[in-house]
A protein has these predicted regions:
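Short, acidic loop-to-helix structural element flanking the phosphoryl-transfer center
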Residues: 63, 68, 91-92, 99-130
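Short helix-capping segments at alpha-helix termini
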Residues: 31-37, 80-88, 147-151, 180-181
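Residues in soluble alpha-helical coiled-coils and helical-bundle/repeat scaffolds
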Residues: 15-16, 106, 110, 184
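Active-site neighborhood of HAD-like aspartate-dependent phosphohydrolases
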Residues: 1-50
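A metal-dependent, Asp-based hydrolase signature
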Residues: 46, 50-100
């Protein structure tokens, strides 16, 4: 069936978040005098990302709020750094610490180099939208900052407001409804194999897994999921760059 709409994941697909995260955390730890609390910058980043994954998963399961997971991530990270009283840090203090980190991270945030050219190519031919495991105000602000918000139909569909997170079928179907296009006529593009590609395919959309590592990319651009030696499931198309979407 012909495609009439395209939905996108944000982080790791359009927004190169890993590089901004690493630079922002390093700068923040220097400013806070915490760099010596870890064996190396790489170890600090490893701890930060491990805690982020755990606390963000709690948010996605509905066990914490979007703000709450940031506060708890901050407490646990500072506790890992040996900061006295970190575990009992008040919400406003934890939120202020995280806000300072985010401000530093945001100075280096950018879209992937292939994002704008791909969206320019698609915008005149398809309805474009966003389905993201995040909060709407957060993702709208981010997309505006990296110059991509204007490409997408409103509402942006995000898990906090929708009430369920990818890979639940309902959030993909809500994205299709926002476009006004039937699921079978919508492609979903994301960098996480299980959450994005398998979830979209199982919801009845045309699934496209962005695996930047397939094109030789590493680090900030690597896709997440199946692994280099694993063949994708039936019904999942693999691309190494968003520029390949021109052949939809």
């Amino acid at each position: 069936m012909a495609i009439r709409g395209v939905l996108f994941d944000v982080d790791g697909t359009l927004y190169a978040f890993e590089g901004a995260e690493e630079a922002g955390l390093h700068e923040h730890l220097v400013a806070e005098g915490l760099t010596e609390r870890f064996a190396s910058p790489a170890e600090a980043l490893r701890v930060w990302r491990e805690l982020k994954e755990e606390e963000y998963d709690r948010f996605l399961r509905g066990e914490s709020t979007f703000t709450g997971q940031k506060n708890e991530r901050t407490r646990r990270f500072l506790a890992a750094a040996g900061v006295v009283g970190a575990s009992e840090l008040a919400d406003d203090a934890a939120a202020a610490w995280f806000a300072d980190y985010a401000a530093r991270k945001n100075t280096t945030r950018r879209a992937f180099d292939d994002a704008k050219p791909a969206l320019d190519d698609l915008a005149g031919r398809y309805r474009l939208g966003v389905v993201s495991n995040s909060a709407t105000v957060h993702q709208r602000s981010k997309l505006e900052a990296i110059g991509l918000l204007g490409y997408f139909a409103e509402p942006l569909v995000c898990s906090q407001e929708h009430g369920a997170a990818k890979p639940a079928a309902s959030i993909f179907l809500a994205g299709c409804e926002a476009l006004g296009v039937a699921p079978a006529e919508v492609a979903y593009v994301g960098d996480n194999y299980e959450t994005d590609a398998v979830g979209a395919r199982d919801a009845g959309l045309q699934a496209i897994w962005l695996d930047r590592s397939a094109g030789g990319a590493t680090g900030d651009g690597a896709g997440v999921g199946a692994g280099a030696d694993t063949a994708p499931d039936t019904g999942i198309r693999v691309i190494a760059s968003l520029t390949e979407l021109g052949s939809l």
